[in-house]
Amino acid sequence: MKSHATRFPKFNKVVNVVPPDKIPTNNITRYHVIDPAGAKNWFMCWIAVDESGTFWVYREWPGVDVGDWAEWRGGKWVPGEGAKGQGYGIRDYIELIQQMEGDEEIFERLIDPRLGAAKYQVQDGSSSIIEDLNEAGMVCIPAPGLDIDDGLQALIGKMSWDTTRPADSVNRPHFYVSSECENIIQALSEYTGDGGLKEAWKDPV
């Protein structure tokens, strides 16, 4: 089901979704993006950026093997199995991340600055997700606190190209997603922005 008012009208599964073996592995810079949550699962993705500034999203967690991030129920999208928290703590997430990355060299880890920096009480004072990750050896940088619309516009810009002319090395989108990242693909197809912070597909975007 494709939302009529999707925020990414240029996103096309035929054009923007590629097999995993088409994702470049040389001359790239790898980024890890984290959207932490409280009771829900964190949503994470890994992006390779090549020398032309093209974004290649090559991994997500949770994937659909954990569960769909959102489900169509009662005439609307609601949080699905993939969004349900699994009781993971900081250490669990670090082990999961290390297991998935193997020997990949990650240039930078970006985290949502709002929840990532939110303080909570611990035995000897207060801490935050960013501080706890840093202390455990996984240094994360707060992502620029852009307005949501600014972030969406940047992504729309990466997808933009002249669809009236044949695609070539210049006239093409600069954003691609691995076919294995099914939750992100669905989110880009369905996200409207109309549901604000509560919209079911917001986190993968």
Q: What is each of the regions a protein language model found here?
A:
Residues 1-36:
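ATPase catalytic-site recognition across NTP-hydrolyzing enzymes
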Residues 8, 16-20, 39, 116, ...:
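A generic signature of intrinsically disordered, low-complexity regions enriched in glycine/proline
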Residues 28-29, 41, 172-174:
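Short, surface-exposed beta-edge/turn micro-motifs
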Residues 35-38, 113:
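Short, flexible loop/turn elements at secondary-structure junctions
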Residues 42-47:
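Short beta-strand scaffold segments in enzyme catalytic cores
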Residues 49-51:
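Short loop/turn segments immediately following beta-strands, especially the blade-tip
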Residues 53-200:
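Mg2+-dependent endonuclease catalytic cores in nucleic-acid-processing enzymes, primarily RNase H-like
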Residues 201-205:
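Short, intrinsically disordered, charge-balanced linker/junction segments flanking boundaries
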